[in-house]
Amino acid sequence: SKDGLKFTFHQRKGVKFHNGEELKADDVLFTINKMMDKKAANINSYQFEMIKGAKEVLAGKADKVSGVKVIDDYTVELTLSYPYAPFLASLTSAPASIFNRKAVEEGGDKFGFDPEYTVGTGYMKFKDWTQDKEINLVRTDDYFNDPAKISGVRYLMNIDKSTRRMMFENGELDYMPIDKTIYDTYVNDPLWKDNLIKFLAPSMDYLIFNQNDPNMAKVDIRQAVTKAINREVFNQT
């Protein structure tokens, strides 16, 4: 809407969760209510707190987020309590991922741990997880878009840098992030320099004023701090 308070989303048809359930507007409704549920104590509830009625649910004063309206199976309308410029950008972040109602309700405490109930809509699905050791993903063959070109991914966790480097150089790892401490070693090595890949990682960094602080609640102080920031230097760091 022109006042920046109302957003209407038309969902793509045929997008399926890994349990075969189609993603529908009801899943969006369920997700937002679940994220704001006081009992869930979700650390990512801030993603939706600007939606009308969300803070009331988080405070235990209401059962449902009033600003979420299901129009039909593939259309949902979200109404905000106040204009929030980064709203659309925040919805693209991982904490705003949509849950499948059936998987969460049937899985209970197993959701997030058991592959049967931990489902998404991506081109890779959860196969198994050995806590603090590894996570295995496999290709989703009925993915709604172009399928992955590899059959799966194995993530190894909690490997110290020296062991990780040795495994990579022995061909036991296909990919390894490097930091500045070993960058020069690889970039100057004829064997490895052509295998280095530089890329821009999509991210959004920002500074936020805590307006619960009486000083930061004053617009003059916020403007003064904003004007004092050297944007050119800030953007280069």
Locate each region found by the language model.
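Surface-exposed binding/hinge segments that line
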Residues: 8-10, 27-29, 36, 45-103
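Ligand-site clamp/hinge motif
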Residues: 107, 112-115, 140-186, 223
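Aromatic- and charge-enriched surface segment that lines or borders ligand/interaction sites
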Residues: 1-43, 77, 167, 215-217
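Gly/Pro-rich hinge or "lid" segments in bacterial periplasmic/extracellular proteins
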Residues: 63-66, 80-148, 152
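Alpha-to-beta junction loops
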Residues: 28, 74-76, 169-178, 192
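Periplasmic-binding protein-like
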Residues: 91, 197-209, 212, 216-237
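Ligand-binding "clamshell"
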Residues: 185-198
